Amino acid sequence: MDAVRRLLIPVAAVLALVLLPTSAGASPASVSAAAVQGTRPLDRTVWLCRPGLVHNPCGQDAEGMPQSAGPELVTHYPSGGTRLLDATRFTAGASGRREPFTVTGKPPVDCFYAYPTVDLLPNPPLQTGGRPPVPRDVHHAVTLMQSARFAGLCRMFVPVYRQVPLPALLAGIVVGSGADLTTATMDIRDAWDDYWTHDNRDPETGERRGVVILGHSQGTAVAAALMRERVDEHPGVRRQLVVAALLGGNIEVPEGRDAGGGADPASTFQHIPACRRPGGAPMPTGCVVSYATYSLPRGSLPAVIGRTASPGHRVVCVNPAALLRGEAAGARVPLDLYLPTRRLIGGSALLPNGPLAVPLNGYQLPDLPTGFARHPDALTGECTHATDGTASADWLQVGGDLSHFPASAPAGLTGLHAMDFNVAQGDLVALAAAQTRAWLDRRRP
């Protein structure tokens, strides 16, 4: 619970400036606590995206191929409207060029994604018993923004879960009660069990499929809890893990080691290591990529995310661009930035950031006809470590053209938290593809 509070405090503090006021009858924290106490497991998983759904928002059929005619993947908002995942690519001295997003072969592995905190109110409003949450546009918008471009590699599994909403996170911090993720963790764990039981076996071969686990912010917290229970201590399940990209949260390891080793309660995982590739070693699989994104002045440390006061431990920072290139862990390398556009997330003239108006407060997204604006060399990133006598911190230090972000964001309390996936989205997808190839090669006789 302390780790969860360290993760969520700065996010809640910033959101306090933009959240709607709550009623005077009961604080969101007390409402949330009461709701958690009265909940039970869902009768069935609520899927935002699952291959083969009749109207799959992620646009995939049962095999992961586009449901629509043609190779471009067409996604669907729950309230209506379609979006492509294409990008306008910008390079120095050249005008933008459209890059379509196509799927031409059956995805060889699966992706299981836990989205970050986006609910402003409890979903469902009355969280008692097994009342199910409802898929909403905000869940789809953040899925498109963060994880949908993995669909060329993965069949996408995205459960809707009863997360702690933003006002309740804030109120929990204010009154000192913390965030109770019991129900959120239960829903994600049960969705995983549903997936593992009914969907993980390949329909053609009958063999278990490889899995990429994705999470961000609260999604990272619940995905990490799921992995501790269902993956870390189970060698047979660990063998199916291609990689876990758990961003915007603290994944902790002992100093000088990449996992806990079996008996270190302060480590997030005992057996699943951080992804490392020393000295041109083969591409690692079955490991974790994690970072929090900032652009801090020299001598500064992140406020909370990326920071730990646990003696003898550090927060994991793995730069996906450096790992992909086989560079040293602390190397400064270009990042492949994919900014979501107003069109992608359903923005309008009245509400430019659409259903993500609160999480993306202050961001001015590109107004383009494509889903993303790609700037492959606008940013650089390097994993950075520092201490201040009371804590140590590890984070992805971003440099280059920061004009794409609000001026106060890069060095603020949460840094570029809202864009953790996007600052290196091209690298994350390319890395997962390379790790998938390595994982498949190692399984061949």
Segments (PLM) and residue ranges:
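Flexible, membrane-associating and regulatory peripheral segments of lipid-active enzymes
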Residues: 5-9, 13-148
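Active-site catalytic motif of lipid deacylating hydrolases and related acyltransferases
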Residues: 51-54, 60-61, 67-72, 104-107, ...
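Extended hydrophobic secondary-structure segments that form protein cores and membrane-embedded regions
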Residues: 112, 212-215, 243-247
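Residue-level signal for short, function-critical loop segments
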Residues: 117-118, 217, 250
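Short, well-ordered amphipathic alpha-helices
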Residues: 143, 223-231
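Short, well-ordered, mixed-charge alpha-helical segments that flank or form enzyme active sites
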Residues: 165-168, 221, 251-255
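Surface cap/lid and interfacial helix-loop subdomains adjacent to catalytic sites
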Residues: 182-207, 228-411, 415-419, 425, ...
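Gly/Ala-rich beta-loop-alpha elbow adjacent to hydrolase catalytic centers
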Residues: 214-219, 223
